[in-house]
Amino acid sequence: MDIFRKAVSSPDQAGAEAAGLRWLAQADERVVAEVVGVTGTSISTKRVRESRPSVAAARAFGEALCRVHQAGATAFGAPPEGWEGANFIGRVEQPCEPCERWGEFYAEQRIKPFLGGLPEEVSDSAFAAADAIAAVDWDVAPARIHGDLWAGNVLFQEDTAVMIDPAAHGGHPWTDLAMLELFGVPFYDEILRGYGVGQEYHQWVPMHQLHPLSVHALTHGSAYYAPLERAARATLEALR
């Protein structure tokens, strides 16, 4: 077996990621990297044999991602089975505390924790958007989501794609789709077609991008300030 070994910054990062991969794989092991070993400093997975992205593979991945989401979670913010406590988006720790309401979870655990280190003129609109999101009673069930699904964490194969490096938790399914759009992924429209997402999804893309934009504004700086503000304003407009 050809093994890929990834160094991590802490035992908790390794444990959370491994638990996330195994949890996602329970729903469809064909589209999740297989964990073969975990230490305090690394996580090892079966190496993914990559191929050129294609329409057919993107559509098949969209179908599989929908199945993974539909496997569900016990609550919003619930960590993967076999793990307790925070997980990591990249190397940044984020809370995973089970919550009954998606809006409250998303605002308090996925947006606000990353805004404190930003200039007030940037964070004010994002805080306002978070409060507005939390005030809504969203009609959605907890989905089993990857949580950090940018293009670099989607490795295409001949007939589908494989997910790596998750920040898996119970969340809103559109959060994964919106992150794919934010950072660009080959054949995005075909992924949506395979997934079967409705037109109403597009109105809420900026809201679901507030989490990754908040994280990147904190970790990567001013290049993400304007995109974060635009997403916050679009969210507030959609919620009026």
Predicted regions and their residues:
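ATP-binding pocket architecture of kinase catalytic cores
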Residues: 1-104
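An alpha-helical support segment within catalytic cores of ATP-dependent transferases
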Residues: 73-144
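Short, solvent-exposed loop/turn segments at secondary-structure junctions
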Residues: 10, 38-42, 50-51, 111, ...
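Short strand-connecting beta-turns/loops that link adjacent beta-strands
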Residues: 29, 40, 158-160, 210
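Short helix/strand-capping connector loops at secondary-structure junctions
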Residues: 205-216
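Active-site Asp-x-Gly
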Residues: 95-107, 140-144, 151, 155-206, ...
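Alpha-helical elements of Rossmann-like donor-binding domains used by nucleotide-donor carbohydrate transfer enzymes
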Residues: 19-23, 60-67, 128, 190, ...
